[in-house]
Amino acid sequence: MSTAPVRYVLGGRFDLVEVISEGGTSTVYRAIDRIGLWAREQSPEVAVKVVQPNGKMRQKLVQLLHREARLLRDFVHQNLVRIYDSDYDGKYHYLVMELLNGRSLAHILADRPGQPLSPSVSFHIVRAVGQGLAHMHSLGIVHGDLKPENIFMTSTGEVKILDFGTALMPNASPRHDRATALLDQIGLLTPAYASPQMLRGEPRAESDDVFSLAVVAYLALTGTHPYARLPADEALKANLTPAVPPTISPAQWRVLASGLALNRRDRIETIGDFVQRLARPHWFYRWCGQRMPLSQN
C-alpha cells in the first residue's frame, strides 16, 4: 500500500485535493470536506495529515496521531491550529485539522539567513505563541517540541502553533507514562530547541516550553541560534553563554537570558511570566524610563 493518492476520498468524506507537505512519516493534504460542502459551509477546506502506511515505526506513529486528536480536539484558541478529529478508513490513519494559508516561521527565517526579524515582529510572535502555550498549560498540557517549523504565520497576520504530537502532561514520570515512553522510542524531540531536562528524559515542566520559546525569540531577534544549534545538554557541558542581542533593552535581555537558562532552577517557570516581562508594549518602557529597543521597523 502506497501513500494516499490525490483525489482519494478518505473515509468517504475527505477528498484529497493536493499535497501540502511530505515528510518521512506522514503526508499533509489540502482536502475538501464533503459534508461541509453539502452543508454549504463558508469554507469546506481542511488539512489532513495521513500516516504513511509503510513508514518506519508506523504503529507507534499511528498511536501518537490518534492520541494527538484525543488530547487537542477540544482545544479552541486563536493561536493553536484547530484539531477536528482522527480516523481510520480501513487503509489510512489520518488527522483532520484547520487549513492555514501562509508560511512557517522556519520558511520565513530561511529566506533571510543570519538576518533578524524586527523587534516588533519578533515580540508579536512571542506574545501570540505565548498565549497559545499558556492556554495549553492551563489545561495541563506541555507542547514539548516548539520550534520555527511548528509556528505558522497566516496570510492574515495570525500566529498559530502546529504539531502537538509531542504534547504531554507535565510532571509525568517517564517510567510510568506510556506516552512519554512512546515519544522516547520514536525520538521526536528536536535537540536544538529542547531543554537539557527534556533531553535527559526528566519529567516535563512548563519551563521546558519557556526554554524553547526563548530559543525561538533569540533566533528571531538575532538571526542566530543562542547556542550555535548545539543540543542544550551539550551547551551546558561546554558552559556556553549567548551573546546579548543589540536590539533589546537590558531589562529585556535579563528576561530572555532567564528563559534561555540551561539549569531549570535558573529559568523563568511560566510562559505567562516570561511573555509578560519580555514583550511588554512600547509605552511601558517610556513610562518607566527604560531604554527601548533600537529598531521597531
Regions found by a protein language model. Give the residues of each.
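AlphaC helix of the protein kinase catalytic domain
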Residues: 106-117
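Activation segment signature within eukaryotic-like protein kinase domains
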Residues: 125-126
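AlphaC helix of the eukaryotic protein kinase fold
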Residues: 52-74
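Activation-segment/catalytic-loop signature of the eukaryotic protein kinase fold
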Residues: 86
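Protein kinase catalytic-loop region centered on the HRD/HxD motif
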Residues: 131-141
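Conserved short submotifs of the Hanks-type protein kinase catalytic core
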Residues: 90-104
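C-terminal lobe helix-coil module of Hanks-type protein kinase domains
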Residues: 192-287
